[in-house]
Swiss-Prot record:
The keyword Ribonucleoprotein applies. The gene is rpmH. Gene3D superfamilies: 1.10.287.3980. One of its GO terms (molecular function) is structural constituent of ribosome. Residues 29-47 have a biased composition (Basic residues). PANTHER family: LARGE RIBOSOMAL SUBUNIT PROTEIN BL34M, MITOCHONDRIAL RIBOSOMAL PROTEIN 34 FAMILY MEMBER. The keyword Cell inner membrane does not apply. GO terms for biological process: translation. NCBIfam families: rpmH_bact. GO terms for cellular component: ribonucleoprotein complex; ribosome. InterPro entries: Ribosomal_bL34 (IPR000271), Ribosomal_bL34_CS (IPR020939). This is Large ribosomal subunit protein bL34. Belongs to the bacterial ribosomal protein bL34 family. Residues 9-47 are annotated as: Disordered. It comes from Symbiobacterium thermophilum (strain DSM 24528 / JCM 14929 / IAM 14863 / T).
Length: 47
């Protein structure tokens, strides 16, 4: 048998780097995500 480990090890830096506002703005797809969230009326656009 194998043991299942907890895969989510939270770190604020990696969280911001992958899902933050600047990383969203840096790519075309990310800007699309922000646009979609604005249109939907999300209170928080990014993390």
């Amino acid at each position: 048998m194998f043991l299942l480990k907890r895969t989510f090890q939270p770190h604020n830096r990696s969280r911001k780097r992958t899902h933050g506002f600047l990383s969203r703005m840096s790519t075309r797809g990310g800007r699309r995500v922000l646009k979609a969230r604005r249109l939907k009326g999300r209170k928080r656009l990014t993390v």
